[in-house]
Structures are given as structure tokens and as C-alpha cells.
Amino acid sequence: MSDVTLSRASSEHVPLLLELVAEFCEVDQHPYDPARVTLALGPLLDDDQHGVVYLVNQDSGYLVVTWGYSLESGGREALIDEIYLRRRGEGLGGKVMGALFVDMAARGVVKMFLETETHNRRARAFYARQGFDEDDSIWMSREISATE
């Protein structure tokens, strides 16, 4: 397989991204709301302030990375919010991660995070091969309503 290309998605790619996100949600059995996804994509496609959306080899998949900042990490952090590849088990994922690490270093990222389900051993093994460690910390979340 040839080298991987990560290209920054733009607003013209929304139809393709919605198709890819729908596929991802179907595979991972997540709810899919195209209106919510379109709204969330907007700021990421407008500029890099909040993060970046990449297309993998134009239409082989997508990757969403968002920014954070931490004293503990010593600077800029990146969270792999979503990654979806149409074809798996062919080595593309490792190439995508390698290209992503190069781009993240160029953007000043000092630490990367991701979250995957506990039961997804295949994903956990893949991420471990890419150098990610399982932390002892626990992710917690809370929805924030517009009326708070």
C-alpha cells in the first residue's frame, strides 16, 4: 500500500464526512444525528482554533482531533475524538497514526489522548502498538444544558 495522505477537510467535504460519520456510528453502534454532527463540524472546518478534521486518502476514512491545554502535560494536548477507516486490518491505521504524530509534533502538541470502550480489546491493542498507555485515571462526563 502507498503512503497515507491526511488532508484537512473543509466545508465542501461535509456530505462525504456525514457519510463517513454515519458509517462509523453504524459500525460502533453509536446514535447518529446528522444535524448535530453538521453543527459540531462547522467550527472545526472553519479554522484550526478548536481542532482539525482530516480525510484519509481523500475518502478512505476520517479523523477528528481537538485541542486542550494542561499544566500536568506541560502544554498543548490533542484528543483523538474520532477515527474511522473504511478498511481495517491492512496496515492503514498504523500509517495514519504515524502521519498524525508528525503533524501533531509540528503543531506543538506535547501529549495525545484518546478514549475507547473497555470491551474493545482490538482497538486497545492497536493503540498500545502505537505507543499509547492505559492510564489509571477515569474519564467522567456531564452534559451541559444551554439554560445553566
Language-model regions, residue ranges each:
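Terminal substrate-recognition subdomain of acyl/acetyltransferases
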Residues: 2, 129, 141-148
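Hydrophobic adenine-recognition pocket in adenosine-nucleotide-binding enzymes
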Residues: 9, 83-85, 116
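Residue-level recognition of the GNAT/N-acetyltransferase active site
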Residues: 68, 86-88, 117
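Conserved acetyl-CoA-binding loop-helix of GNAT-fold acetyltransferases
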Residues: 85, 90-102, 125-129
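Conserved GNAT acetyl-CoA-binding A-motif
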Residues: 105-116
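Conserved acetyl-CoA-binding loop of GNAT-fold acetyltransferases
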Residues: 128-137
